[in-house]
Amino acid sequence: PETLTPYGIKTLILNESCVHLDKNRPRASLDLLYSEVERLGKIFRKEAKAKKLIKNWKSRVSEIKSKLVNYSGKRVFLYDSGEDKPFTAGKFAMPTAMIEALGAENITSNMDTSWGRTSWEAVAAADPEFLILLDYQSGGGAADLMAFLKSHPAMKYTSAVKNEAYVAIRYEELTPGPANIEAMAKMAEAMKEVF
């Protein structure tokens, strides 16, 4: 924003995407998604449509939650990419909010970032029970990620890998936006088959 202001260009800082600009903000939550849409509604003078959209999302989230089995304390790991060190979602990333809204726990939610790298040792030590595999819809997608995890010397012994407990979620379903809600439904349905 500082580089554009001198040119008279107004900017909007998106909460999840620009976390590096405000490390004092709260953890990711669905409320942050809703507030972003409210902000956009105000900017484009579409407040009524924004409120209706948010109301519909909240209703759908309530519907998803009403069908949940007890996922309390279930350990989930989101694997985006990386073989030397896994790239994953931290406490400011929307997937953490989605996982927590389902009552489960993102094992990397202690990472003080939205997205970042951790170690395989830390992931294996947390023994995830369920995996969210990011599917960029290129190459082998989630199948390739799972094949890698099955061959990894530490990860192959984790509960999620041994039980092939995972769901493939597309990138756009995990970045803040309308697709988050149905991605939560996909996650809940896949978790129901495991737990």
What is the role of each PLM region?
Residues P1-T5, Y34-G41, K51-I54, K58-V61, ...:
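Extracytoplasmic/secreted envelope proteins and their assembly/folding machinery
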Residues T11-N15, R75-D80, N106-S109, F130-L134, ...:
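Structural recognition of the beta-strand scaffold that forms the well-ordered cores
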Residues I9-R39, G73-M94, A142:
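Extracytoplasmic ligand-binding site segments that recognize negatively charged/polar headgroups
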Residues M111-W120:
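Short helix-initiation/N-cap motifs at beta->coil->alpha
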Residues P6-I9, L102, V161-K162:
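Short, structured coil segments at secondary-structure junctions
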Residues R27-R45, F130-F195:
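Structured C-terminal subdomain patch of bacterial secreted/periplasmic proteins
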Residues P1, I9, W120-Y136:
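Proline-aspartate-enriched helix->loop->beta-strand connector
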Residues A48-L102:
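Basic- and aromatic-lined ligand-binding clefts that recognize polyanionic substrates
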